[in-house]
Amino acid sequence: MSTESKCPFNHTAAGGTSNKDWWPNQLNLNILHRHSALSDPMDKDFDYAQAFKKLDLAAVKRDLQALMTTSQDWWPADFGHYGGLFVRMAWHSAGTYRTADGRGGAGGGQQRFAPLNSWPDNANLDKARRLLWPIKQKYGRNISWADLLILTGNVALESMGFKTFGYAGGRADTWEPDDVYWGSEKIWLELSGGPNSRYSGDRELENPLAAVQMGLIYVNPEGPDGNPDPVAAARDIRDTFARMAMNDEETVALIAGGHTFGKTHGAGPATDVGPEPEAAGIEQQGLGWKSAYASGKGHDAITSGLEVTWTSTPTKWSHDFFKHLFSYEWELTKSPAGAHQWVAKGADEVIPDAFDASKKHRPTMLTTDLSLRFDPAYEKISRRFYENPAEFADAFARAWFKLTHRDMGPRARYLGPEVPAEELLWQDPIPVVDHPLIDDADVAALKAKVLASGLSVAQLVSTAWASASTFRGSDKRGGANGARIRLAPQKDWEVNQPAALAAVLETLEGVRKAFNDAQTGGKKVSLADLIVLAGAAGIEQAAKNAGVAVTVPFAPGRMDASQEQTDVDAMAVLEPVADGFRNYLKSAYKTPAEALLVDKAQLLTLNGPELTVLVGGLRVLGANVGDAKHGVFTDRPGTLSNDFFVNLLDMGTEWKPVSAANDVFEGRDRATGLVKWTGTRVDLIFGSHSQLRALAEVYGSADANEKFVRDFVAAWDKVMNLDRFDLA
């Protein structure tokens, strides 16, 4: 008999066989319940924005300046300056951002958590964050890790003689990992072409991914799958940087500007490097990549396996990157770790050693650096920057600011004394309120005008939903403020039914103009406000039809953006490929429609009950795209009833698929065989999925109609105001 002590607890944090193990295709609702108050250690009344406003930013920057040149024996600074390390840390914090779904980025300080803290591309950034801990400890809750990581990158640049474009705080920390799809691969840095490859066809990268391999931020610096071909690498660079909202000029500026500083590390073989932080022993205290190669640090450090220093002044802003790029011819070589890199042919040794002042080296470059010379489009930009240093400096400053602030959303979220005054197109600018706002009496009068305009409840509700539901909690873009639903590209999106939308907007514009023309004190209502107000009027009427008196909350203050304030290409990524709330799929996808619904709900920051009540309410209000009848489980559309749930849960109905793709279903009366309803996967999932069915049963109960209406109104109001950072 074994004498090994057996733990009496089998259901501990150490894990066990999970539901996901048993049913790997089960719909995952966990993403709707991340970052709740249960994981947040701060007091309930803690307001990070107010805490940051009390911060002495200048004092923090002085401490960071001192840190830059205070080398620590446990992780010595290259060239006696941590600037290059901290630039990389900030870049990699922000650089996970991707435009397709707005996820990733610096907000929340996710670099502290798995998987990002253990990505191969983030090797030894754990040391950078530990170097920062005394400063974070000193200022505590007044500066988040998320803000500190980016501020440190800015100070690093400034300490090396570069003038940055500005800095904004306002990134509140999160306290657990995001649940983000980073790819299907099961092996770090797995090459393309495998069974879980993110590439298909002619090297077409899977959406929404924005990196070429699992565990990389953007591209493989050795070239595609390690092939040292600068021209082929340029294609990867262009694709991945575009997916992070950067054009060619911004891309060249970022690569050249970032690689003006510091060095890469590849002193020895990767086999000497220990496990990443999440796999390291508990005694490592959250650090990883412990190296057995010589001292394992400083001159002996191994990070990427590459051993490259780009400029002769790696701790000072200079023009050396382009000077070296164009002044030399380059020959392929290998680092001490065996990685492909390039060395200047026949060049003098002008590059300082990071730890031995008596040594010099020839200039070296990465394959992806040479892309800036050998790709024709990049070469033109690089030559222009080479010949115009001031233009290059300005381009890098602006691109760095964009990189580090892209996921913050509108300027209303920016905090601190270093926020640049210039308004930038990628910030989706909206005019500031310049007139008196409507009051409660005006709201009541406008609701009456809207209801008397001839527009139906379905038209009012679907238009307001279309306007507000573009919001993404990931990068804080979209939403009803700005009324961009009336502008390109949103007015032409298929999901918005352009012809029908134009008619609704024309009617609402007539109501708006009549109201504004009648005012004598300069009071106005914006179309952005009126669209939301009209939706509220429609819901109140629909609730009244159900016998429930309710007032939908409304806060004026939205403004109307202009077409000139709207970047059409940047706005295009907000177009829904699916909106289960409106029973819409743009085309067939490998991902099930119900998973796309949950993804949309997560971007709208909704939880399970909010998702459930909104779908049920929008169905009976007739908000489906194209007036489709799928999921309209009621004989009284336009009435805010709980009929969707009552009829879905009715055991007198038997459901069967009627499409080859199993995406459309008929519900027939079990007794007569007659078709009662039709529905899609996003309808039937509320009866099929055990958690969603439990929620549906709450709203389908005999005593639930009033609760359903009030919960629907609360969830609706939340969506309508997701972008109202001015109300915070």
From Swiss-Prot:
UniProt keyword Cytoplasm present: no
Q: Which amino acids does the record list as binding heme b?
A: H259
* Site location (Transition state stabilizer): R88
InterPro entries assigned to the protein according to its UniProt record, in alphabetical order: Catalase_peroxidase (IPR000763), Haem_peroxidase (IPR002016), Haem_peroxidase_sf (IPR010255), Peroxidases_AS (IPR019794), Peroxidases_heam-ligand_BS (IPR019793)
Q: Where are the transmembrane segments?
A: none
* Name under which the protein is recorded: Catalase-peroxidase 1
Give the sites of the cross-link named Tryptophyl-tyrosyl-methioninium (Tyr-Met) (with W-91). Y218-M244
Cofactor detail note: Binds 1 heme b (iron(II)-protoporphyrin IX) group per dimer.
Q: Where does the record place the catalytic residues?
A: H92 (proton acceptor)
Write out the similarity annotation. Answer: Belongs to the peroxidase family. Peroxidase/catalase subfamily.
* GO MF annotations in UniProt: catalase activity; heme binding; metal ion binding
List the cofactors.
heme b
Task: Name the catalysed reactions.
Answer: H2O2 + AH2 = A + 2 H2O; 2 H2O2 = O2 + 2 H2O
Q: How does it assemble?
A: Homodimer or homotetramer.
Q: Biological process GO terms, please?
A: cellular response to hydrogen peroxide; hydrogen peroxide catabolic process
The record's listing under Pfam families reads: peroxidase (PF00141)
Upper taxonomic lineage: Bacteria, Pseudomonadati, Pseudomonadota, Betaproteobacteria, Burkholderiales
Underlying gene: katG1
Keyword Heme annotated: yes
